[in-house]
């Protein structure tokens, strides 16, 4: 049965877009902020990342979820009429006048051809994940971050779950997965905010000591 989860979050960081971009571009560091992540691996020759997560099924049985993604980064403009994505994104946000026009987009796209994954544990499944992180430069020199993620995971149903109507079970499983993802995303961003605050404080102390 395929389970689909979605999450979206928004946070404002007390750092400029340059500093925020450096942090969010560090794929391994960012993913490790996810409380369910147990391993991140980069395959340099393929330019793809492998994530390994430990979650639980509806009966609290452990599941190992593996994802392969490729990271892409690009800039976009909120006020350029020729920038289709920028115009679409600008229509979604409120108080657009509080932002500078130039913004950054980081995408994690699912990879369909990937290395074979061997696991010593049962209930290991390879899923698909896609994320979009948009960093907007506020005019007060802070960074507004929009983080959206979609995943899908196809796993086998164990007894007695396989006796339930699949439609009902899928609805429940999708809701649980989305709840887990939302909590994980919010936890990640809290860790990011903490790291950036600590980094800013360290820089202030260093500057003050000179």
Task: Give the positions of each predicted feature.
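Generic recognition of cysteine residues
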Residues: 16, 33, 37, 134, ...
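A conserved amphipathic terminal alpha-helix motif
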Residues: 163-210
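Noncatalytic linker/hinge segments flanking ATPase motor cores
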Residues: 50-53, 91-98, 132-133, 137, ...
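Beta-strand/loop substructures that line and gate deep hydrophobic ligand-binding cavities in soluble
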Residues: 84-174
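Hydrophobic ligand-binding cavity/cleft-lining segments
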Residues: 1-88
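Short, surface-exposed, polar/charged, turn-prone segments marking secondary-structure boundaries
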Residues: 69-71, 78-81, 137, 173-179
């Amino acid at each position: 049965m395929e389970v689909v989860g979605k999450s979206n979050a928004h946070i404002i960081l007390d750092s400029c877009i340059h500093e925020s971009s450096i942090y969010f571009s560090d794929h391994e560091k960012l993913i490790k902020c996810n409380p369910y992540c147990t391993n991140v691996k980069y395959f340099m020759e393929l330019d793809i990342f492998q994530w390994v997560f430990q979650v639980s099924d509806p009966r609290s049985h452990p599941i190992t979820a593996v994802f392969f993604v490729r990271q892409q980064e690009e800039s976009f403009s909120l006020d350029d009429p020729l920038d289709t994505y920028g115009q679409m994104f600008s229509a979604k946000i409120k108080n657009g006048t509080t932002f500078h026009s130039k913004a950054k987009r980081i995408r994690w796209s699912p990879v369909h051809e990937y290395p074979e994954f061997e696991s010593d544990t049962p209930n290991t499944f390879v899923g698909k994940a896609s994320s979009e992180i948009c960093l907007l430069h506020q005019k007060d020199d802070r960074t507004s971050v929009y983080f959206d993620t979609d995943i899908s995971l196809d796993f086998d149903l164990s007894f007695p779950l396989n006796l339930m109507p699949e439609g009902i079970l899928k609805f429940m499983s999708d809701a649980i997965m989305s709840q887990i993802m939302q909590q994980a995303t919010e936890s990640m961003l809290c860790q990011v905010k903490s790291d950036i605050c600590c980094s800013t404080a360290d820089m202030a102390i260093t500057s003050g000591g000179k």
